[in-house]
Amino acid sequence: MAVLVHITSIENEAAIKRAGIKPGYRNVVFFMPHMKDCFISHQWARELKRFGIKNFAAVDFKIPDDEEIWFGKYHLQHEKMELNKAISLFMNAEDKLGYEFFIDRKIEPREIIKIRKIPKPMGWRYQPHAHGKKPCPCPRCLQAGGYKTKKLKVSQ
């Protein structure tokens, strides 16, 4: 069984210890395989910061290798497959940025190994490889009240 990591707010620590990780956005639990390269394992933390999380925690857990999970690149079609197959595809990918793993069930407290504080969020913002590219000015991509949103709308 591989060790997996779910990034959340440190404020959820007590609830997670008591009741496990409950499905949130889209009724799923997002996670990544735990790797030596923290940038890859924690790549979603910086994106989560945009939604108001200030202090982060990494929840390490294990689920059976043959469990069905969803896997794919951000904003692309995801496939349902066994965890071990998804991890194998991920580990062999040339570019590991932007991949998502999620499961459509609760992670039970007995499956949790440990919860640890992450010192600061790392990873990409908006989308992988966005650094140095101008943001898309379409209304779907621009968030109301976002950084330089007004300026981007005027420059269209």
List the predicted regions and their residue ranges:
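ADP-ribose/NAD+-binding catalytic cleft of ART/PARP-like enzymes
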Residues: 1-30, 37, 44
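Conserved NAD+-utilizing ADP-ribose enzyme module
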Residues: 24-27, 36-156
